[in-house]
């Protein structure tokens, strides 16, 4: 049986890892073993943070909406409740964009929410 020489494959594997690790500091971009370990961590972090990014953006949007709503005299909770009662279906991403870039439109939405809250019956304490 013929002998299998793996030099080409091994070199290719090492070169691939070192290319992926270019830009890292010190040994992590120059030594194969350190670069491989760093790449394992990097891939784990990127996988985790792609999922965490969604929650981070939602948190940012809610913070922006809350700040703009409070500037107009409503809390975030009451504002969203009023929008739901009035049947306005605008997501938080768009609301945050309006709060930052179009204050007049956001103020109009606050007035719609305020009117819906005023028209809704107050919940009674049980």
Curated annotation (Swiss-Prot):
One CC-aspect GO term: ribosome
- Single annotated GO MF: rRNA binding
Set out the biological process GO terms recorded for this chain's protein.
ribosomal large subunit assembly; translation
The answer to keyword Cell inner membrane applying to this record is no
What are the UniProt keywords, alphabetically?
A: Ribonucleoprotein, Ribosomal protein, RNA-binding, rRNA-binding
KW S-adenosyl-L-methionine (keyword) present: no
Q: Which PROSITE patterns does the UniProt record give?
A: RIBOSOMAL_L20 (PS00937)
Which Pfam families does this UniProt record tie to the protein?
A: Ribosomal_L20
The protein's role, per its UniProt record: Binds directly to 23S ribosomal RNA and is necessary for the in vitro assembly process of the 50S ribosomal subunit. It is not involved in the protein synthesizing functions of that subunit.
Q: Which family does it belong to?
A: Belongs to the bacterial ribosomal protein bL20 family.
| Name of protein | Large ribosomal subunit protein bL20
Which species is listed as the source?
Answer: Frankia alni (strain DSM 45986 / CECT 9034 / ACN14a)
The uppermost taxa in this organism's lineage are:
Bacteria, Bacillati, Actinomycetota, Actinomycetes, Frankiales
Gene symbol? rplT
């Amino acid at each position: 049986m013929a002998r299998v020489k793996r030099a080409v494959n091994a070199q290719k594997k090492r070169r691939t890892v070192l290319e992926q690790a270019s830009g890292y500091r010190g040994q992590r971009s120059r030594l194969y073993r350190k670069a491989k370990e760093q790449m394992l961590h990097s891939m784990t972090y990127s996988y985790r943070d792609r999922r965490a990014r969604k929650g981070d953006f939602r948190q940012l949007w809610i913070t922006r909406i809350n700040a703009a709503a409070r500037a107009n005299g409503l809390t975030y909770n009451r504002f969203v409740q009023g929008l739901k009662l009035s049947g306005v279906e605008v997501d938080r991403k768009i609301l945050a964009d309006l709060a930052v870039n179009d204050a007049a439109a956001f103020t109009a939405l606050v007035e719609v929410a305020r009117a819906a809250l005023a028209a809704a019956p107050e919940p009674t304490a049980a």
